[in-house]
């Protein structure tokens, strides 16, 4: 049983360390790309594919989610106190709603795309 707990703890530590955090300075694209080099590669490939400049991609993500991979709209309040449902199903870097994201996955053939992954959101 002790070995199981050790294995579980190590696995949990590895999973948590693999999670992406918000870049330190989201106002400076150079510092973002210094922290996350792969993000630059993904943004550059998106620029080649769609023609959208990198600074425009980053500006949209900054306004939509502020580079928070788990960003969701704030919950509405019931009687101004009780948290209620969210106004939309938008989520992740792109803040795409469920229907739009499903359409994107069907059109691109990328069934494993997630809204919380930067590569898929740009």
Region spans (language model):
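C-terminal motif of bacterial Sec signal peptides marking the signal peptidase cleavage site
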Residues: 17-18
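Sec-dependent signal peptide recognition
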Residues: 3-12
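Short linear sequence elements within intrinsically disordered, low-complexity coil regions
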Residues: 12-14, 109
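Intrinsic disorder/low-complexity signature
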Residues: 2-3, 117
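Catalytic glycan-binding domains that act on GlcNAc-containing polysaccharides
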Residues: 21-122
